[in-house]
Every structure is written in C-alpha cells, then in structure tokens.
C-alpha cells in the first residue's frame, strides 16, 4: 500500500488554497415592496441608474424609470404576474440593449429583439443601446438625395429626402399604413434598408403587413419590430427606440435606412399609462410633462450624417460615404383634429407632414392626400431634376382648382378660361389617384406629369384619365425601355429627353386605344 508523503499533502493543500478564488462581485440588491399593472416598486436599490436593467427572480427583467428617495419604480419587460412582494431584485449595471445588424433583415422581432416569426434564433453579432443621443449639429449634412415613395402625389408635391422626418397624419382608415407599406415596397432597387415598427396594432393586422411584404419581395431588406395591442405598455413604449437602434446600425456605417413608426399616438398612450401608474403628475390630456421629449429624442435620431461621422464611427473602415436614417412617423387623429396635444407636438418636431383626409378617401381619391396643408420643409432640394422641373405646376393647378371649384358652386355661367382651368384641375386630381402596392418609378411619374402639363390629356374624358395613364406607362415601358431606364438611373432632364417623351406620347395617342 502506497503511503502519502506529508510534505506532498501540505504542498497539495497549499496549491488548492492558492487556486481558491475569493473575489466577490458586489451586487446591489433590493426587495420588491409593491407589484401592480406591470409596475414594481423596489426598496433598497440605492445605486440604480435611470433606464438600468433590473433583474428579478425567474430570469425576468425590468427597467428603472423612477428614482425616488427611498425606492425605485421600475416597469416589467414581460409577464409581471410571476412577481410577488418580498422577492429580490438586483441591479445589473447595464442599460437595455437590442441585437443589430444585417442578420435581422427579413425577420419579425419583439421590442427586445427576440424573434417572434418562428424562423429560429437570430445570430446577430452585435448589440446596441436602445436609448442613444442623436448625432450633433456638426456631424449632420443637409438633405439632398431623394427617397422615392412611389406615390405620384407625394414625390411630385411633398418630396421626401434621405435623412428627413416626414409625418403621415390622418384619421383612422384613411390609408396611412398603406402609404407606409408602399414606401417600403418602392425601395426594392434603391438599396435602402427598411424597419417597420408596429405599435399597439392587432396581431392579425401585423401578420397581414408581413405577408404583403413577403409577397412583394420587400421582406428581404426589411425588419419588422412588433409590439402588439396585447403586449405590455412597456413593450409598446420601447418598440420605436428599439427599431431606431436597428436602423441606426446602417446609418452609422454609411448606408441609407428608412424607418416607419406605426403609430406614435399609441406609443404616447402607452407612455401615459406607464407614467400614471408610476404616479407621475399628469398634464394636458393626462399626458405626462415630458411627452414632447418622448417623441423629440426619438425623431432627432433620424438624420443624414456626414462622411466624417461615418469614418470616425467605423474607425476608418468606411470612407467617403454619408449615412442616413429617414423616418416616416404616423399619427392618428380623432375626427380630423390636428390641434390635439400629440399631433401638434409631432408636427413641430418633423420636417413636414402628409395630411390624409377622410372626405377625400370616401370620395375615391386615394391616396387621400390634402395637398393644401401637406408640406415638405426640406425635401424640395432632394428631388430629382426631372421631377422638380416637371412637377412645379401640379400643386398650383390643384390649389387653383379647389378655389375655383368652391367659387363655381355659386356661379351659373363661367368664362372659357375658368372652365378650362377647372377641367385641368379635375384631370390632375384624377391623375394623382393610384392603386395600392403599385409604386411608380421616377420615369413613370415623369411621363405622366409631362403628358398632363403639355395638354395631352385635355381631350381625354375625366373618368378615363386613370386608364389612359396606366396604358401610357405600359406603352413607354415596352416601347421606350432604354429611355425609361436612363431617366430612372440619372434623373436628368434635357431637350433630348423632353423630345423623346413628347414623341413617345404622340406615338401612343396616334396608335393606341385606351
């Protein structure tokens, strides 16, 4: 039998003692003293930061929103029903982060970046903070490149540029979501990555949107962030910030991204609910005092950043490229009241608004854009040359038509010039009508608007304008494909292009039926 040497035993014991890790990680721990409606009040978390992740028993997390003298108010990110008074809560020392990167394209995720489309886990290499400071004035660049929405009425009269914030506002059932989805579909060949944030919508509605994006092939360059109506208010509050962080990944690397918030009215309602449960003092319409800041800090993150910013952010990996994040926030009004609290806030934050009207929608004018009060404050400098040159008279024609139409109701006999102006206005109104999921390219719009401006539609019946326009575009796409391709790629307008368009329209009118 082998005997152990006492010196060996002592050496072994010394080695074990030397290897023993006695370091301790100090965790700030508190006790839950109240749980109600997704809000917990925790006693004893002295070192909690605002917005810090709080860990509860059972792997559940919360977010610290109220830092009071003797307690912390936190909102639970998930099902709060498993939490009880007396359970422990721990600080994590981290703020909320979500996965970012190209791996999220084509996927549907919740407000925390977890996949909810049944297609397995997302192998994202990077995460980023949900709440970030927007780029400063020095790092920004003016908006001078277009985002084609595919809508004639928008691209000609209310153009949107890369890095712009353009509000889509209107009552329920006026086509706000349809316009946003069409804007995503129109980016098929533009290289713009898209993020669609659904806030407080029915799950069936979100499923329909995803299905339509898949059918049109748009899901390949789109991420859908969904916080449905059944999700906790905290998720609906966080979803826009999460989506914005996912979009910023592309902006900061010299690419272009488009984000749609559908809609921010429901986010404001969710935030009001959280604030009231946290016992914050209510203000106008029971919203908390910082509801303006809720939206301004979100929408300020949409911007066009300079090549220097991109180069600095990527440590020189990407040079000579500007990045942009374009935002199309949606606001739902009640009975057309644009002077309510949240609509006026968002109107003042954004760079213009597209106002959709119920009366126009019901009259069959779709998209139901009211060109009179819709405006784009910075998009004009981002329009392509050909659209800018040709679309100048469209808004004027519609404004004059509306004025004359109101006057003509009381006048029995009209002079020839007034009658012609009225008829031209009617034709332009018809021309702006468009089917859903059928975006017009730059060339398509150029041909349509040129035909209208030069009087080629004057002899076409008003009710046949839509059919005439569709037939004209189809003719140009088949017979003048190289010209259309040139216009789409360059956006230039010169005498040769004008002559070619003119010849094409005359040839169409001489040889085709419509």
Curated annotation (Swiss-Prot):
Report the locations given in the UniProt record: Cell inner membrane
Query: Where exactly is the site Required for activity?
Result: 374
Q: Which keywords, in A-to-Z order, does the entry hold? A: ATP synthesis, ATP-binding, Cell inner membrane, Cell membrane, CF(1), Hydrogen ion transport, Ion transport, Membrane, Nucleotide-binding, Translocase, Transport
Q: EC number(s) of the enzyme?
A: 7.1.2.2
**Membrane topology type:** Peripheral membrane protein
Q: Does the keyword Cell membrane apply?
A: yes
SUPFAM superfamilies linked to this entry: C-terminal domain of alpha and beta subunits of F1 ATP synthase (SSF47917), N-terminal domain of alpha and beta subunits of F1 ATP synthase (SSF50615), P-loop containing nucleoside triphosphate hydrolases (SSF52540)
Chain sites annotated for binding ATP? 170-177
Q: Name one GO cellular component term.
A: plasma membrane
According to UniProt, the reaction catalysed is: ATP + H2O + 4 H(+)(in) = ADP + phosphate + 5 H(+)(out)
According to the UniProt entry, its GO molecular function terms are: ADP binding; ATP binding; proton-transporting ATP synthase activity, rotational mechanism
Q: Does the keyword Transferase apply?
A: no
NCBIfam families named in the record: atpA, PRK13343.1
Q: How does it assemble?
A: F-type ATPases have 2 components, CF(1) - the catalytic core - and CF(0) - the membrane proton channel. CF(1) has five subunits: alpha(3), beta(3), gamma(1), delta(1), epsilon(1). CF(0) has three main subunits: a(1), b(2) and c(9-12). The alpha and beta chains form an alternating ring which encloses part of the gamma chain. CF(1) is attached to CF(0) by a central stalk formed by the gamma and epsilon chains, while a peripheral stalk is formed by the delta and b chains.
Q: Which family does it belong to?
A: Belongs to the ATPase alpha/beta chains family.
Chain's role? Produces ATP from ADP in the presence of a proton gradient across the membrane. The alpha chain is a regulatory subunit.
HAMAP family associated with the record: ATP_synth_alpha_bact
Q: What is this protein called?
A: ATP synthase subunit alpha
Name the source organism: Acinetobacter baumannii (strain ATCC 17978 / DSM 105126 / CIP 53.77 / LMG 1025 / NCDC KC755 / 5377)
């Amino acid at each position: 039998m082998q005997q152990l040497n006492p010196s060996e035993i002592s050496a072994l014991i010394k080695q074990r003692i030397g290897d023993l890790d006695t370091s301790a990680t100090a965790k700030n721990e508190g006790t839950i003293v109240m749980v109600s409606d997704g809000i917990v009040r925790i006693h004893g978390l002295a070192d909690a930061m605002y917005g810090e992740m709080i860990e509860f028993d059972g792997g559940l997390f919360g977010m610290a929103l109220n830092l009071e003298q003797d307690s912390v108010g936190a909102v639970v990110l998930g099902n709060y029903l498993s939490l009880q008074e007396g359970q422990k809560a721990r600080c994590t020392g981290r703020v909320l982060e979500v996965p970012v990167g190209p791996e999220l394209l084509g996927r549907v995720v919740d407000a925390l970046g977890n996949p909810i489309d049944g297609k397995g886990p997302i192998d994202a290499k990077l995460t980023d903070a949900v709440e970030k400071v927007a780029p400063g004035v020095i790092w920004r660049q003016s908006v001078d490149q277009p985002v084609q929405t595919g809508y004639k009425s928008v691209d000609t009269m209310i153009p949107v540029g890369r890095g712009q914030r353009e509000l889509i506002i209107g009552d329920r059932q006026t086509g706000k979501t349809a316009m946003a989805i069409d804007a995503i579909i129109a980016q098929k060949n533009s290289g713009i990555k898209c993020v669609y944030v659904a806030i407080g919508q029915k799950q069936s509605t979100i499923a329909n949107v995803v299905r339509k994006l898949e059918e049109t092939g748009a899901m390949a360059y789109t991420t859908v962030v969904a916080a449905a109506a059944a999700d906790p208010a905290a998720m609906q509050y966080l979803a826009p910030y999460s989506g914005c962080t996912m979009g910023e990944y592309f902006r900061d690397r010299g690419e272009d991204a488009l984000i749609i918030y559908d809609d921010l009215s429901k986010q404001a309602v969710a935030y009001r609910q959280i604030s009231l449960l946290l016992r914050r003092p209510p203000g106008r319409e029971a919203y908390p005092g910082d509801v303006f800041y809720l939206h301004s800090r979100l929408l300020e993150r949409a911007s066009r950043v300079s090549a220097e910013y991109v180069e600095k952010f990527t440590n020189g990996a990407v040079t000579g490229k500007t990045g942009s994040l374009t935002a199309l926030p949606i606001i739902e009004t009640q009975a057309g009241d644009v002077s309510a609290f949240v609509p006026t806030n968002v109107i003042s934050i954004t760079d213009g608004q597209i106002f959709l009207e119920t009366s126009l929608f019901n009259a069959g004018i779709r998209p139901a854009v009211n060109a009179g009060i819709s405006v784009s404050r910075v998009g004009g400098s981002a329009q392509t040359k050909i659209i800018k040159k040709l679309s100048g008279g469209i808004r004027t024609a519609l404004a004059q038509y509306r004025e004359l139409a109101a006057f003509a109701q009381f006048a029995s006999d009209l002079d020839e010039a007034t009658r012609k102006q009225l008829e031209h206005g009617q034709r332009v109104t018809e021309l702006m009508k468009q089917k859903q999921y059928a975006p017009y390219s730059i060339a398509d719009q150029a041909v349509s608007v040129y035909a209208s401006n030069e009087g080629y539609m004057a002899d076409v019946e008003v009710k046949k304008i839509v059919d005439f326009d569709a037939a004209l575009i189809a003719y140009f796409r088949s017979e003048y494909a190289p010209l259309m391709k040139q216009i789409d790629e360059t956006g230039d307008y010169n005498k040769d292009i004008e002559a070619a368009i003119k010849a094409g329209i005359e040839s169409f009118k001489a040889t085709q039926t419509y």
